[in-house]
Amino acid sequence: MSHCFTAVFEPCLINGKTELLRHNTRLWFKRPESPSFEGTCVGAVVGLNPGSAKGDAEIGRETLGNCDPTMDRILTTFEIAFKLKGLPVPEGAYVQMLNLFYLRDACASAAIAARDEIAQLLTNARDKAEEREFPFLWLAWGKSARADDVDRFPTKSK
């Protein structure tokens, strides 16, 4: 399948330098007709921060981009799960990519340092997609997460 993602990249001033935040990231199993295509969400993944993936369009607009290795790994894992269940990946399906914080930086340690120094990265720069409900939420990050990182993600009570 031809994996890709859609997202909105927004500028953010950090220590006098313009950095990018990546919001509403959707990982697509197959390239959608347009960046604003709605599609069907099959689940959500929470990662640490946006890595190196870049979009094709201008800042502040929905854009298409090529998946980075982490995004490809996530989609491949979902494809394996569908295959093991004996189900096809639904047409127009995507995985919503959420993050503990949304500063795009290929160097995770630099992004973590910025997050710890600048509280606005957690409070003012959240992704509106976090407010949605998803079929399930896969928490996928390492030791760098803090205990309070998970608190803002809604959970369904049984």
Residue ranges: model-predicted function:
Residues M1-T63:
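Active-site and ligand/interface coordination hotspots across diverse enzymes
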Residues G43-G51, L98-Y102, L139-K143:
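Short loop/turn segments at strand-loop or loop-helix junctions that form parts
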Residues K54, E58-A81:
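A short mixed-secondary-structure module that forms the rim of ligand-binding clefts
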Residues L64-G65, L84-V89, E130:
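Structured alpha/beta reader/binder surfaces that contact nucleic acids or chromatin modification marks
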Residues N66, T70-I74, Q96, I118-L121, ...:
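Amphipathic alpha-helical interface surfaces
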Residues F82, P88-A110:
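Short connector loops at secondary-structure junctions
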Residues D105-K158:
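Glycine/proline-rich loop-helix segments at beta-alpha junctions forming the active-site rim
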